[in-house]
Amino acid sequence: MKKCFVVMGFGEKPDYATGRTLDLDKTYRTIIKRAVEEAGLECIRADTVIHSGTIDTPMYQLLLEADVVVADLSTSNANAIYELGVRHALRPHTTIVIAEKQFKFPFDLGHLLILPYEHLGKGIEFEEVERMRAALVTAIKTLVEKPATDSPVYTFLPALQPPSTAPAPVVQGFAAAVDGLVA
């Protein structure tokens, strides 16, 4: 099954640009996870990855190997913006950026296509959840079927070749061990 790695903050986080607090877990549960699964992909967020040690190794591996990455930049989370940059350096396509409508994006992100949604802070209206979920399903299916360059790195450096996405042996062994425990 194809995989989608979700880049975003967790829990309730302050949006310092607007002074609001956004429940990012609600965005994940009601919009992103549902859309990814409806599009037929496995949805993975860093806080759901079983690992030993630091999250860095599986995070970098997922940024490289995921068939699709959805990055929610709503609260200008530095980690999410950094991970988006890493993804853009590693893969030329299949990266989707979303953000709450009041998101004040940094200048360097101004050229990206960012799918907006309206967040009310603690919640999201049902109609908005359904609208954004449908838009995200369409975006995911379109990118999986017809990948187009969405990375500024590969747009401006067209001769650049992405690294191999063959799974690392250590992580393959770890995944096999986890599968053995679950089975």
Regions inferred by a protein language model and the residue ranges of each:
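Short acidic active-site motifs
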Residues: T54-M59
